[in-house]
């Protein structure tokens, strides 16, 4: 279906707005993936706070101009599916990586975070805010418990020396 100039401008503006508000972006090729599987992916993306769209490469190049995802322009070849993470930087990467494991024909082309091309595994393994807080609290709790044990051990040793 041919798009007129106004439609193209609207697509570029919409993708540009999504890119400006996004934390990270992931590019993939979905050739060969069934419509049912893509529908499942889109549903999972909505639930994860990820906006996904298939966009023509020329329009996508214009849309990401001047954004931190301009570094991805070399990956805009063939059918391009772009996903922007809006709530957590690793959300789109984690979603695409899990989907690629289950679907051999789904190919991840690249990912960007903070203006640089990143490894998909790096982004997919980033902890969420809640996970990071839990890790921090675990580390703090572990340090406090260790200090308490060492204090009691020192007190025990001191009492044994006095006796």
UniProtKB/Swiss-Prot annotation:
Q: Which UniProt keywords apply?
A: Ribonucleoprotein, Ribosomal protein, RNA-binding, rRNA-binding
* Xref: Pfam families: Ribosomal_L10
Q: Which InterPro entries match?
A: Ribosomal_uL10, Ribosomal_uL10-like_sf, Ribosomal_uL10_bac, Ribosomal_uL10_bac_type, Ribosomal_uL10_CS_bac
Q: Which GO terms describe its molecular function?
A: large ribosomal subunit rRNA binding; structural constituent of ribosome
Q: Which GO terms describe its cellular component?
A: large ribosomal subunit
Q: Which SUPFAM superfamilies match?
A: Ribosomal protein L10-like (SSF160369)
- PROSITE patterns in the record, alphabetically? RIBOSOMAL_L10
UniProt superkingdom: Bacteria
**GO biological-process terms attached to the record:** translation
The family classification in the record reads: Belongs to the universal ribosomal protein uL10 family.
NCBIfam families, from UniProt? Answer: PRK00099.1-1
Assembly with partners or alone = Part of the ribosomal stalk of the 50S ribosomal subunit. The N-terminus interacts with L11 and the large rRNA to form the base of the stalk. The C-terminus forms an elongated spine to which L12 dimers bind in a sequential fashion forming a multimeric L10(L12)X complex.
Q: What does this protein do?
A: Forms part of the ribosomal stalk, playing a central role in the interaction of the ribosome with GTP-bound translation factors.
HAMAP family found in the cross-reference section: Ribosomal_uL10
* Name listed for the protein in its UniProt record: Large ribosomal subunit protein uL10
Q: Which gene encodes it?
A: rplJ
């Amino acid at each position: 279906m041919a798009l007129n100039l106004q439609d193209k401008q609207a697509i570029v503006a919409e993708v540009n707005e999504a890119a400006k508000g996004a934390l990270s972006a992931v590019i993939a090729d979905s050739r060969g993936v069934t419509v049912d599987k893509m529908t499942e992916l889109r549903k999972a993306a909505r639930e994860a706070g990820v906006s996904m769209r298939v966009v023509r490469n020329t329009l996508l190049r214009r849309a990401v101009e001047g954004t931190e995802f301009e570094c991805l322009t070399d990956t805009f070849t063939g059918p391009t599916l772009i996903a922007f993470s809006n709530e957590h930087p690793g959300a789109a990467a984690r979603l695409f990586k899990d989907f690629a494991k289950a679907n051999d024909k789904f190919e991840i082309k690249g990912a960007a975070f903070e203006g640089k091309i990143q490894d998909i595994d790096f982004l997919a393994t980033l902890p969420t805010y809640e996970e990071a807080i839990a890790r921090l609290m675990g580390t703090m709790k572990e340090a406090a418990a260790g200090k308490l044990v060492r204090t009691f051990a020192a007190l025990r040793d001191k009492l044994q020396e006095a006796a």
